[in-house]
Structure formats: C-alpha cells, structure tokens
Amino acid sequence: MTDRYILAVESSCDETSVAILKNESTLLSNVIASQVESHKRFGGVVPEVASRHHVEVITTCFEDALQEAGISASDLSAVAVTYGPGLVGALLVGLAAAKAFAWANHLPLIPVNHMAGHLMAAREQKPLVYPLIALLVSGGHTELVYVPEPGDYHIIGETRDDAVGEAYDKVGRVMGLTYPAGREIDQLAHKGQDTYHFPRAMITEDHLEFSFSGLKSAFINLHHNAKQKGDELILEDLCASFQAAVLDILLAKTKKALSRYPAKMLVVAGGVAANQGLRDRLAQEITHIEVVIPKLRLCGDNAGMIALAAAIEYDKQHFANMSLNAKPSLAFDQFPDSFVIN
C-alpha cells in the first residue's frame, strides 16, 4: 500500500506550525514557531502582532517541516489547514499559505476545525474508541463534546462566559505572574492548600454548562481587598484554592456527561490538558472508563493535531476549494461554504 502524507498548517492564534503526518497517526515532523516571548509584555496575545509574526516565519516552517520529515512536496497527498475558530488575521495567514502551496502542487485542500484538532491529537497516542466524550479545555474554549463516530462532533456543554485557560491567565496577571500563567499556577498550587474556598459556579445544577467569570471575579476581589487592607496573601494557597475550584467544576460536569452518554472513552485535550493537577484528579476520580490525554507536546496549538484530524476528513474525501475563507467564530457543526465532497 502506498503511504499517504498530509502537510498541515496551524496559525489560529500565536503559534505558527507546520507538520507532516504519515498515514493515520505517525507524525514525521511538527515544527512550531512560538510567539510567547513577544506577547509576554502585553499580558496576552495582541492580534496584529500575532499576524505579523505568522507572516515572518510561515515559509520557514514549511521548509523545516518537509526537511525534518525527509520528504518533498511531490510525496504529499493533501494539504490541511485550520480555518477557524481563532483570530481572523492569524487564520488568514495560514490559509493563504496553505492554499497557495496546495494550488502550486496540485494537492487537495482539507479544512480543519481547530477544536477538532485538539480532540484528535489523542489519536497519536492510541486509536480512539467510539462513541466517546471529550473535555476540551484551552485559552479560548471550554467544551464537552459527544463524538459518536469519527468526525461527528456534538457540543453537549460549554462555558457561558470565560474559558478556563482565559481565567487562569487573568488571575495570573492579577498575581503578577508571567503570561501564560497556567503552568506557574499549577506548580504553585501543588505547594499550597485550598484555604480561600472560592465559589464553584453551577456545580450542582443538572445541565452541562460551565461558568468561570464568578470564580475569576471572586479571586480578583479577594486579592484587591487584601491589598487595600494590607493583609498578607499566601501565593501558593491562592493558586491552590483557585485551581481546586476549577478542577471541581471540570470534574463534576465531566462525570455528569459520562453518566448520560454511552461513551467508551474520555478524551481530555487542549492547552489546559497539560495541567498536572487536572491529570492527577482525572486519574484518581475517573477509573471506570479509559481516559486519553495527548502528550504534552500536543496539548498546545500545533499543526500535528490538525494533521491528525485531517486524516479522518481525507478518508471521507472531505475537501474544500480555493474559495475557503477564515471563520473566526467557527462552530463544531459548521462546514465551510466551499465544502466539496468528491
């Protein structure tokens, strides 16, 4: 059987990435050019700065990915690209590069939903068993997704306000931590205790929705009031208390989802899936079903996950034409206007 190679492009936020996937789940390369240092001084991602950085490095990422994989453009079977959700300017840079490369090399173009990429990153670790439930936790999204079969995604619960990763970064900024703050909060939390007892919004309610704005506000108010009064705050305990509230909410809603849907596997993915506290709680509390979490290198934004999701669409011959455009608010069940089924 002839090997299949998919080149994938990811540029939805502040990581420029190009990867090569061989067949179903073998990543030959996954080049990532991070912009974290450029955005640290702003305490978050500046869209215009992100777009300019993508333009500067994307050609080099293409070259490095092919070289690292040991193949040439003539060996490729298709080109995949993230077309949403994300920052519109950033998405357009990756789309333009992917479309130009596909057109120049007479290759089909596969449109990929960024969040489907996060979910399917788990395929690199082991074959997924369907139906499954996915908990997707990142800087821009917090979602529970039911996946009855490959490529069929149904959102069954999501945040009503802040995403969990966004909440981490905002409270991290209040504490003076470096952006992105999630890793540092996680590390500090392991040294502290849940002494501040922050609220767990909607944790006992029957639905599968999330809310983190109240938790974030409670944290910020406590911090500001203590500073105004000159009260001492223990940083490790602050982090432990915040993280305990977050994890209680995530675990409670995930358990409810697993009790309501006939899932054979739980996938936990997205940037926050790198959180060691979350991984520990999942291992301790969800033992009746297999839990799959991508390796750390595939938790953040990367083109490898886009390639892994694209492999499923390739099998279905789901390609787009060259009118494919960026969809910054793309939903899981939304397909591009240029969707072509061959």
UniProtKB/Swiss-Prot annotation:
Compartments where located: Cytoplasm
Cofactor: record remark: Binds 1 Fe(2+) ion per subunit.
Annotated binding of Fe cation, by residue: 114, 118, 301
Gene Ontology molecular function: iron ion binding; N(6)-L-threonylcarbamoyladenine synthase activity
Enzyme Commission number(s): 2.3.1.234
Catalysed transformations (reactions): L-threonylcarbamoyladenylate + adenosine(37) in tRNA = N(6)-L-threonylcarbamoyladenosine(37) in tRNA + AMP + H(+)
Cofactor: Fe(2+)
GO CC, alphabetical: cytoplasm
InterPro entries documented for this protein: ATPase_NBD (IPR043129), Gcp-like_dom (IPR000905), KAE1/TsaD (IPR017861), TsaD (IPR022450)
Ligand binding (substrate): 136-140, 169, 182, 186, 275
Keywords: Acyltransferase, Cytoplasm, Iron, Metal-binding, Transferase, tRNA processing
Record bears the keyword Glycoprotein: no
Any one biological process term the GO annotation gives: tRNA threonylcarbamoyladenosine modification
Phosphoprotein found in the keyword field: no
Any Pfam family hit: TsaD
Its biological purpose: Required for the formation of a threonylcarbamoyl group on adenosine at position 37 (t(6)A37) in tRNAs that read codons beginning with adenine. Is involved in the transfer of the threonylcarbamoyl moiety of threonylcarbamoyl-AMP (TC-AMP) to the N6 group of A37, together with TsaE and TsaB. TsaD likely plays a direct catalytic role in this reaction.
Family label: Belongs to the KAE1 / TsaD family.
Protein name in UniProt: tRNA N6-adenosine threonylcarbamoyltransferase
Organism of this sequence: Streptococcus pyogenes serotype M1
Gene: tsaD
